[in-house]
Curated annotation (Swiss-Prot):
The gene is recU. Binds 1 Mg(2+) ion per subunit. One of its GO terms (biological process) is DNA recombination. Endonuclease that resolves Holliday junction intermediates in genetic recombination. Cleaves mobile four-strand junctions by introducing symmetrical nicks in paired strands. Promotes annealing of linear ssDNA with homologous dsDNA. Required for DNA repair, homologous recombination and chromosome segregation. It holds the Pfam family RecU. Belongs to the RecU family. One of its GO terms (molecular function) is endonuclease activity. It is found in: Cytoplasm. This is Holliday junction resolvase RecU. Its cofactor is Mg(2+). It comes from the Bacteria. One of its GO terms (cellular component) is cytoplasm. It catalyses: Endonucleolytic cleavage at a junction such as a reciprocal single-stranded crossover between two homologous DNA duplexes (Holliday junction).
């Protein structure tokens, strides 16, 4: 399918390859974090009846609250009440979806220290009962976003736990993951990669 931009230039939408999801070269909104970009994408999916996926609230225990005004309250002190699991969950095509989103300024690899053991265990538990889990990683300096299947994530995590390398090379994301390129709506079309995962179940 061909698209004509206001300048008169033309662009074509490449076919999706097995290794990546290719979209027209549209850049993300300046200053937005990956979380904000995903929240906007999920809002689009929800408003169009495609999927119901939300950011999980972080569980906190409020300790001290001030009331400078009767109609307003200010939280002065709070603690994380328990370890959070992953960032997002919801339902798509009748499947339970659960995933985490991370950013890194590293240009050659993704440090596994960005994950915690309870997050990995949570995703493993979800998959045991039929859930679909994955991670979305943004290499900020490269402005590249990838969806990586948990099979590949777990392989590197388990290797790290046994003395292996402590990061996932960029080449693994390029060869085994799905590259997600920005488009108009949704901003990050990650469900196209999830479609490929579902097809291979």
């Amino acid at each position: 399918m061909k698209f004509n931009y206001p300048t008169g230039s033309k662009a074509t939408t490449p076919k999706m390859s097995q290794a990546k999801v290719s979209m027209p070269p549209i850049y993300g909104k300046r200053g937005m974090s990956l979380e904000e970009e995903l929240n906007e994408s999920n809002a689009y999916y929800l408003s169009h009846g495609v999927a119901v996926i939300h950011k999980k609230p972080t569980p906190i225990q409020i300790v001290k609250v001030d009331y400078p005004k009767r109609s307003a309250a200010q939280i002065k002190e709070a603690y994380f009440s328990k370890a959070s699991t992953t960032d997002y969950n919801g339902v798509y095509r009748g499947k339970y979806i659960d995933f985490d989103a991370k950013e890194t300024t590293n240009s050659t690899s993704f440090p596994l220290s960005n994950f915690h053991e309870h997050q990995i265990n949570h995703m493993k538990d979800c998959e045991k009962v039929g859930g679909i889990c994955f991670t979305i990683i943004k290499f900020v300096k490269l402005n590249k976003i990838f969806l990586l299947k948990t099979k590949d994530l777990f392989q590197f995590w388990d290797s790290k736990e046994n003395g292996g390398r402590k990061s996932i090379p960029l080449s693994v994301f390029e060869e085994q993951g799905y590259q997600l390129e920005y488009q108009m709506n949704p901003l990050i079309p990650y469900l196209k990669a999830v479609d490929k995962i579902i097809e291979n179940l």
